[in-house]
A protein has these predicted regions:
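Bacterial N-terminal signal peptides
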Residues: 13-24
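Transmembrane beta-barrel strands of outer-membrane/channel proteins
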Residues: 49-57, 97-103, 168-174, 213-223, ...
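Outer-membrane beta-barrel biogenesis signature
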Residues: 24-50, 60
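Hydrophobic, lipid-facing positions within transmembrane beta-strands of outer-membrane proteins
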Residues: 47-49, 78-82, 146-152, 166, ...
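Short loop/turn motifs that connect adjacent beta-strands in outer-membrane beta-barrel proteins
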Residues: 37-45, 87-97, 110, 157-166, ...
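Outer membrane beta-barrel transmembrane domains
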Residues: 62, 121-126, 232-371
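Transmembrane beta-barrel domains of outer membrane proteins
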Residues: 40, 85-87, 153-156, 197-205, ...
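Outer-membrane pore/translocation modules
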Residues: 105-274, 316-324, 337
């Protein structure tokens, strides 16, 4: 049981620069990812209120092909999540229901650096014109509520004596959010989202009720509906230094070839948005060093795959956004109960790789209270 954007593609003449990235829905998911200790079955008939606050910051974008680019990029969010969990028994199994609602706030002006803006292909001027060079895409954004999520769960394995647990938790998320199809970045995609979550935990060394080292594994499978009222958003694009030769090209083309910024104005084309199924895996190795407060520290690793995102225009043309749910991330988690009913958890996350998406450096705090 895990406690708790629209995409853009730059086109310049015949050159296509993929700058797709999934914020909003994926960022909100990250705020309430399964964390160490969530695999332990809780007592029956308790209420759990959980507050999350996640700060994400990206100074570079993971490349679709080749290396990442770390100039002129700022993509930053402050995500808060409120969550409620209630446990009860079903046929002798610890089970329950849960719901959470995220709010995604974009911090400051959002933008992504562009390593190289290719020049247009103009046969009348000899074919491929020189590149404009490095530049920046200005990303419009809308803060707001993400999609609500509703789930149920049941611990089919519950062996406290050996510290072994197994949980099954399906989720559903209706397409209700602060989505604005004309923005580059959004708090959600407004698609029906279905998730199947599986968790397993067991003690490797030590006593489950004392100092111990455990392993916790999580698998999450996502399936998505379509958003028929979405749009393919093109950001405003500017070059850092436009080659002087473009002054001549501008004159020769009667102004058709830009020689001044912005090279491309922002635009929005109505389209249907689709996302293919995606898969996520997490592994944690929590070491509980102070049993009196259940204090632990845990390294972790996260990997996602799949999730190809496409737009189908009204004329039937399908555009690959370039974005995938393909991310590799290191994690470090520490937590302790500060009273009999309140736990505080700190999480640090560092992206190693991301396919066409921000390489995030995240800090998160989670406060859970039992009543």
């Amino acid at each position: 049981m895990h406690y708790l954007a629209n995409h853009r593609r730059l086109r310049l003449a015949a050159a296509v620069l993929p700058l797709a990235m999934g914020l909003g829905l994926h960022a909100a998911r990250a705020a309430e990812d399964s964390l160490p200790g969530d695999g332990i079955a809780q007592p029956l008939n308790v209420n759990i209120g959980i507050f999350y606050n996640l700060f994400t910051n990206a100074g570079k974008v993971g490349a679709v092909h080749g290396g990442s680019y770390d100039k002129d990029t700022h993509i930053s969010t402050d995500i808060t999540v409120a969550r409620y969990v209630r446990t009860f028994a079903v046929d002798g199994f610890v089970s329950g229901v849960q719901v959470y609602e995220p709010y995604v706030a974009f911090i400051g002006a959002q933008g992504a650096g562009v390593a190289n803006i290719a020049g247009p292909y103009v046969p009348a001027l000899g074919g491929q014109l020189p590149a404009y060079g490095a530049g920046r895409a200005n990303l419009s954004s809308d803060s707001g509520f993400g999609q609500p999520n509703f789930g149920v769960f049941s611990y089919l394995i519950n062996r406290p004596d050996s510290g072994t647990y197994g949980v099954v938790s399906p989720w559903i998320s209706p397409p209700i959010s602060g989505f604005n199809k004309d923005k580059s970045l959004n708090p959600g995609q407004n698609v029906w989202t279905y998730e199947m979550e599986l968790g397993f935990r067991t003690t490797l060394l030590g006593d489950p009720n004392g100092q111990n080292l455990a392993v916790e594994l999580w698998s999450e499978s996502y399936f998505f509906g379509a958003n028929n009222n979405s749009a393919l958003v093109e950001p405003q694009v500017s070059a850092n230094h436009i080659p002087p030769i473009y002054g001549e090209y501008n004159l020769l083309s009667g102004g058709a070839i830009p020689d001044a910024n912005p090279l491309q104005a922002a635009s929005s084309t109505p389209a249907r948005f689709n996302e293919q199924p995606s898969q996520e895996f997490r592994i944690y190795l929590p070491y509980e060093f102070l049993p009196a407060t259940r204090a632990f520290i845990s390294p972790g690793f996260y990997q996602s795959m799949g999730g190809k995102q496409t737009y189908t225009l009204r004329n039937g043309v399908k555009v690959d956004s370039g974005n995938r749910t393909n991310e590799s991330q290191l994690r470090l988690v520490a937590a302790s109960f500060v009273s009999q009913t309140t736990q505080i958890m700190l999480i640090g996350e560092y992206d190693l790789a991301a396919h066409g998406a921000p390489l995030n450096r995240n800090v998160e705090i989670r406060i859970a209270t039992f009543f």
